[in-house]
């Protein structure tokens, strides 16, 4: 049975569980508990960045002084409020 050599990279990025079998032989199980957490964190940050870009875009659009946009402006504001509430809930 071959055993994998641990490099500094695998030691730093993988969590190593060492279990003892009934016959006294030790086995190593490599897992990535932090990779899932990191991906989740990355996605959360990226969604916030996307949200910020949308807010900046809508604020720029809404700041335009065009009388034909009066009714659109209120409609968009209502939709934006609903959308942002749903985003923060989920």
From Swiss-Prot:
Annotated family: Belongs to the influenza viruses PB1-F2 family.
Region (Disordered): 1-31
Annotated positions for site Low pathogenicity: 66
Start-end of Polar residues biased regions: 1-27
Function (record text): Plays an important role in promoting lung pathology in both primary viral infection and secondary bacterial infection. Promotes alteration of mitochondrial morphology, dissipation of mitochondrial membrane potential, and cell death. Alternatively, inhibits the production of interferon in the infected cell at the level of host mitochondrial antiviral signaling MAVS. Its level of expression differs greatly depending on which cell type is infected, in a manner that is independent of the levels of expression of other viral proteins. Monocytic cells are more affected than epithelial cells.
Subunit (UniProt): Oligomer. Interacts with human SLC25A6/ANT3 and VDAC1. Interacts with host MAVS.
Keywords (A to Z) from UniProt: Apoptosis, Host cytoplasm, Host membrane, Host mitochondrion, Host mitochondrion inner membrane, Host nucleus, Host-virus interaction, Inhibition of host innate immune response by virus, Inhibition of host MAVS by virus, Inhibition of host RLR pathway by virus, Membrane, Modulation of host cell apoptosis by virus, Viral immunoevasion
Record organism: Influenza A virus (strain A/Goose/Guangdong/1/1996 H5N1 genotype Gs/Gd)
Compartments (UniProt record): Host mitochondrion inner membrane; Host nucleus; Host cytoplasm, Host cytosol
Predominant location category: host cell
Source species, domain of life: Viruses
Gene name as annotated: PB1
Misc: Is not encoded in all strains, and seems to be dispensable for replication.
Pfam families to which the protein is assigned, alphabetical: PB1-F2
Region of interest (Mitochondrial targeting sequence), ranges: 65-87
One of the record's GO cellular component terms: host cell nucleus
HAMAP family for the chain: INFV_PB1F2
Gene Ontology biological-process entries: symbiont-mediated perturbation of host apoptosis; symbiont-mediated suppression of host cytoplasmic pattern recognition receptor signaling pathway via inhibition of MAVS activity
The protein's name in its UniProt record: Protein PB1-F2
Family annotation (InterPro entries): Flu_proapoptotic_PB1-F2 (IPR021045)
